[in-house]
Amino acid sequence: MIELAAIHHQPFNSDAYSYNGRTLHIKIRTKKDDAEHVAWFGAILTNTPAHMESERAYVAKIGRNKQPMITGLPKCGLHSGSAIRIYLTALMIETLFTEAMVHVRFRYRQTHVLNFRLFMRQTRLMHRLGQINRLVSNFSGAFRAGGKICSGKPLPWGRKDPEAHDFFGGHLQGIMTSWTIWKTWGEAGIYLTPIFAAPSNHKYDTLDYCSIDPHFGDEELFRTVVSRIHERGMKIMLDAVFNHIGTSQEWQDVVKNGETSRYKDWFIFILSLLKKAAMIHLRLVPRCRSSIAGTRKFRLICLILRCTGSANLISTAGVWMWQMKLIMRFGRNSGKPSPEKPDIFILGEIWHQADPWLRGDEFHIGHELPVHRTDDSLFFRRIDFSSQIASRINSQKMSGMKQVKEVMLNLLDSHERILTRCGGDQRKGARLFWHSCLLRQGRIYYPRKSGFTAAMIHCAGSAWFGKRKNRIKRCLAFMKPLIALRKQENDVLTYGALEWKLVDDQNDFVSFSRTHEGKELIYFFHQGREVRRVRLRDLKIASDKRIYDAWTEEALHDDDVVDIQPGDFSFLGRSKFC
């Protein structure tokens, strides 16, 4: 008996949509183990749909964990005037495509009927952004100085723990003197944290969106940097922080008068923190409250600046992408490209699920924090079982369109921040590897000179002393091949199907694979306390395929055994013999 209340399918949205104009993706959610088999039929629609004839194709289950089972239809032909029927054991789902719309009817033993309608038009098709694959973030103020200091008096390296208004001399010229770093890392683009005029080092309290901060250089130097980046086949992305108001007159009135200020409702802040000396830190840079008319006016001014002065700067300099911080706090259409540069890509930062914002063409791509938190709960906080993590990843994977997930720029984090959060335990590098092999595009945050830890404040981090150089070198030695591997296996990691091989809660062991065009990558992550032995014979390798260690490219054999240490990972490849 199928539980009807557990059946979920919403035409279009992320349950039924066109992937590329030739392929239709359909997803159906049922209660765990309710549907043993799923099959679909496709045929040209006639006046007698009951006479549909077609070859039957079976669909594999995508997720099967403690959460309700998710079953998907990976591919089927999409033609105007065609019809598709999907069967789940006793449950029949009938989808009829006509010239104008799609009728979807759920039937249970021909007695229970749910009706849906869906318009599938060419203008509704969403195409993925093919140019995005590797992006490295850069915190310019503490990255590297490249000769003469542009402005201000920088602090000597390691003199003190940095505060919001401390400056270490990093500027745009330093980016041009670091080409060997970018070449070694093999990145496709550089994302600069805010570089517009602001008093702090993090620049989130922007004063002028139309000029480069003197700490970093000037407009001429910026154009030169962008030009040199383009010469090396790379792209550049800027950070827009219109959601913060900086040190404006209205905010200063709140700081001075507190509850009695006429502007106190303009901002989101904790009043008690204003009385503390730390109020200059980023966490206390106010965020605008979108429901207040005054802040809407301020945001309008920001958008005018974006469409005039800032847009002129990025269009003439050749900037490729602009990230909009906390885009969900803005109104609709605020993320659309300006008329001055319609070909610029807009990346939206979302603190929750980003897919709904992409469906409405608010911006081109996005990154969502729930993915980051899911990874952390497995490797750092250790508050969830492996099966819960797998289920959550399935839900994230199935929540949106595949072409959207393929270009989601979720933050991969920096090797320095990872070491800080895990207390210096370098085995936590598995966290970086885990993130890079799932369905998303990695964006590495490399904000500081080698030797900075990543303190969780939005100004520069603290400096490492003693053995910091050796630790950083070991981290870099891990990150470089990781980036190279992501570049080499980009097709598999972008388009490949995800299949969970083993999710063992008792021993904290997870294994899954990514498969694309005959090539399979198999991953093993072990967070338990004992050494885990993996016998390759248990993988049931076909005789016409070879297996190898994908990290070292060393050939392996059917009778080999791979030992995975606690907190470590292993990575195997399987493909046909050349």
Curated annotation (Swiss-Prot):
Catalytic activity: hydrolysis of (1->4)-alpha-D-glucosidic linkages in polysaccharides so as to remove successive alpha-maltose residues from the non-reducing ends of the chains
A biological-process GO annotation: carbohydrate metabolic process
Pfam families: Alpha-amylase (PF00128), Alpha-amylase_N (PF02903)
Keywords: Carbohydrate metabolism, Glycosidase, Hydrolase
Entry EC no(s): 3.2.1.133
Any one GO molecular function term: glucan 1,4-alpha-maltohydrolase activity
Origin superkingdom: Bacteria
InterPro entries per record: Glyco_hydro_13_cat_dom, Glyco_hydro_13_lg-like_dom, Glycoside_hydrolase_SF, Ig-like_fold, Ig_E-set
Keyword Hydrolase set for record: yes
Enzyme class at the top of the EC tree: hydrolase
UniProt function note: Converts starch into maltose. In contrary to other maltogenic alpha-amylases BlmA cannot hydrolyze 1,4-alpha-glucosidic linkage next to 1,6-alpha-glucosidic linkages.
Family to which the UniProt record says this protein belongs: Belongs to the glycosyl hydrolase 13 family.
Protein name: Maltogenic alpha-amylase
Protein species of origin: Bacillus licheniformis
Native organism taxonomy: Bacteria, Bacillati, Bacillota, Bacilli, Bacillales
Gene: blmA
